[in-house]
């Protein structure tokens, strides 16, 4: 009989292996567009923020993976013309970012390929199994 600790360790290893494989496939897709997973995530966050934009702190708080240097991440996206940033008049330390039309166009071009990839990655699971997986991972997560 497998002990609970062994089952937990096996579950952990399987989650990490699966996540690594899923992200690796997405990385390959994004690489064709000269984007990293982290940059893609930041662009999606800014698209979701809409006209209100988001501060660097807001972006950091919403990232899927912890990103220690959001400022540098946003610098790279701004240099490529995918986002724009502006300092607040009242407090020059406060910087807000918005996605640009070029950034929106890039994401729009990725929406279908990313959705198709996710469908392919989870094709072996039914909708019900996917919903159960999501709930189980939320229970186990931070």
Regions found by a protein language model. Give the residues of each.
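Charged, amphipathic alpha-helical coiled-coil/dimerization segments
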Residues: 75-138
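N-terminal leader segment of winged-helix/HTH proteins
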Residues: 1-33, 80
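Short amphipathic alpha-helical segments with heptad-repeat character
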Residues: 12, 16, 20, 64, ...
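N-terminal helix-turn-helix DNA-binding core of bacterial DNA-binding proteins
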Residues: 24-66
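Short, locally clustered residues in the helix-turn-helix/winged-helix DNA-binding domain
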Residues: 16, 44-51, 111, 138
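Pre-recognition alpha-helix immediately N-terminal to the DNA-recognition helix
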Residues: 10, 14, 25, 41-45, ...
């Amino acid at each position: 009989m497998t002990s609970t600790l062994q089952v937990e360790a096996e579950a952990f290893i399987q989650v990490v292996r699966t996540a690594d494989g899923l992200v690796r496939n997405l990385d390959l897709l994004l690489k064709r567009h000269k984007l990293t997973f982290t940059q893609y995530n930041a662009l999606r966050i800014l698209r979701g923020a809409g006209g209100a934009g988001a501060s660097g702190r807001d972006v950091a708080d919403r990232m899927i993976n912890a990103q220690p240097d959001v400022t540098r991440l946003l610098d790279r996206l701004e240099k490529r013309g995918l986002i724009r940033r502006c300092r607040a008049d009242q407090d020059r330390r406060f910087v807000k970012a918005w996605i640009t039309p070029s950034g929106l166009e890039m994401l729009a071009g990725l929406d279908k390929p990313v959705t198709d990839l996710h469908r392919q990655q989870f094709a072996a699971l039914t909708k019900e199994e996917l919903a159960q997986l999501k709930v189980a991972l939320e229970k186990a997560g931070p």
